[in-house]
Amino acid sequence: MNLTELEEIGLKNVGKVYHNLGYDELIKHEIENKECILTTSGATAVDTGVFTGRSPKDKYIVDRDPSNRYIAWGDVNQKVSEEIFKELLEVAREQLSAKDLYVTDVYSGASVDSKHSIRFVTEIAWQAHFVKNMFIRPTELELKEFKPQFTVLNACKAVNDKWREHGLNSEVFVLFDIENNLSVIGGTWYGGELKKGIFSMMNYWLPLQNKLSMHCSANVGEKGDTALFFGLSGTGKTTLSTDPYRRLIGDDEHGWDDNGVFNFEGGCYAKVINLDGNNEPEIFNAIKSGALLENVVVNDKGEVDYNDGSKTENTRVSYPIEHIKNHETSLSAGHPENIIFLSADAFGILPPVSKLTREQAMYYFLSGYTAKVAGTERGITKPVATFSSCFGEAFLPLHPTVYAKLLGEKIDKHDVHVYLVNTGWTGGAYGVGTRMSIKDTRACINAILDGSIKESEFDTTKTFKLQVPKTLGNINPEILNPRNAWSDKEAFDKTTDMLANMFNENFKKYQVENSEFDYSEAGPKIES
């Protein structure tokens, strides 16, 4: 590439530039740089250092007109001044100058009308490998004419020593200058920052063009029927959308415009903790040469122990979507027939599957509920409720109601059916009940996708007023209505009221006067 392009973004005396290396070359560099371990599957395994997850409290957006008029400022979207941004940009430039660099050009967005050209600059080979896996890889012809619309400088070896003086959270910084189409990262090596940073930008660009951006997976059946799977991390988006009988469009980030649904990415980023080839064969078999494992434990023979979470429970693998045999090559499909909201309810209250009204769909979309299991100091574990608007609040620069309005319009226009599926616990909360089996969850999903769920008779649950099928295929009918699955009915009722209160408390932020988004009537009602 022309060095003047790097000089234009302030990088000086750059050494060798490894521009758009192929997989074999990247892996060779990773090995030579001692950045990775080669595993028996052919995949490379890397450690992301101190940070094995994103650093949301270190993410800032430059407070500048006109973008500051649209951004929902707060805990998710924190302000940083132009002066501090310029200072940290200089820190990153200094780190990357006089170094050998890896420059990778990719696209975000499979739609011709909505795709953005992105350039990543880093001094770490595996990070170039990661973005090559995760984003859409341009053709040779496209690369010849490539002009980046947005650039990411990853100076992960640099830190902000003046973070206290700047009034920031820590020495780590993940910064976005929307007007100058630039992102700067320092202090963290974690690959997910590269992926989710661009997702945040797509969530800014698209809705302003009246296109919906979504934190969801998507697949399409043989008859052309598209399904979307919304859910927070750990709810099963990747697992459940990776189906041998349906073509995978994508596992995490999508747009929805007048032509239909399209992937933002060209790869998958799957959790691999406790990965079992029998339960998830498509993902297991995707881990081969070209795949990049993060923070897994590898023995001296190069064998991976997927059950070992000693480095982190958030062990991951990125791989190009082509590693999934049954993927949709266009990365796009028509308008969805079904939308599925996934919640891993560790309280064991939500049904395995329920049919939502239009109002309930809006309520549960804005609530974005799941529950995680967190350890306490004494080693006791208990569920913790998590509410993340639109199932992805951490990545939404605009107010959640912007995305909700677009979703509601599209549900109405295309007559989409919406369901809530609990991939969490049944028969009791975490520690008492059991985790919903993948077999039963897949049976629920299959009944939605093949339409057989519509033939069921439905009951309405108390408190949450969710419509649940009385029978569904070979699933034990006792678990379909969650109260029936609990042996201790009094404990169920108490836990139900507790969870209902959490939902109601969370939704108060949308209950403002004259709000068109006050869907609280569709939420749970505690019965005296």
UniProtKB/Swiss-Prot annotation:
Q: What is its EC number?
A: 4.1.1.49
- Gene3D superfamilies according to UniProt: 3.90.228.20, Phosphoenolpyruvate Carboxykinase, domain 1, Phosphoenolpyruvate Carboxykinase, domain 2
Q: Return the InterPro entries for the record.
A: PEP_carboxykinase_ATP, PEP_carboxykinase_C, PEP_carboxykinase_N, PEPCK_ATP_CS
The residue range of the signal peptide is: none
Specify which residues bind ATP according to the UniProt entry for this protein.
Answer: 196, 215, 231-239, 280, 316, 441
Tell me which cofactor or cofactors this protein depends on.
Mn(2+)
Q: What superkingdom does the record give? A: Bacteria
UniProt cofactor note: Binds 1 Mn(2+) ion per subunit.
List the catalysed reactions. Answer: oxaloacetate + ATP = phosphoenolpyruvate + ADP + CO2
**UniProt pathway annotation:** Carbohydrate biosynthesis; gluconeogenesis
Which residues are recorded as binding Mn(2+)? 196, 215, 252
Where it sits in the cell: the answer is: Cytoplasm
Q: Which GO terms describe its cellular component?
A: cytosol
**GO molecular function annotations of the record:** ATP binding; metal ion binding; phosphoenolpyruvate carboxykinase (ATP) activity
Q: Which residues bind substrate?
A: 54, 190, 196, 316
Keywords of the record, alphabetical order, are:
ATP-binding, Cytoplasm, Decarboxylase, Gluconeogenesis, Lyase, Manganese, Metal-binding, Nucleotide-binding
From the UniProt record, list the coiled-coil ranges. none
For this chain's UniProt record, which GO biological process terms are given?
gluconeogenesis
Report the family membership. Belongs to the phosphoenolpyruvate carboxykinase (ATP) family.
Protein task: Involved in the gluconeogenesis. Catalyzes the conversion of oxaloacetate (OAA) to phosphoenolpyruvate (PEP) through direct phosphoryl transfer between the nucleoside triphosphate and OAA.
- This chain belongs to the protein called Phosphoenolpyruvate carboxykinase (ATP)
Where is the organism placed in the taxonomic lineage, from the top?
A: Bacteria, Pseudomonadati, Campylobacterota, Epsilonproteobacteria, Campylobacterales
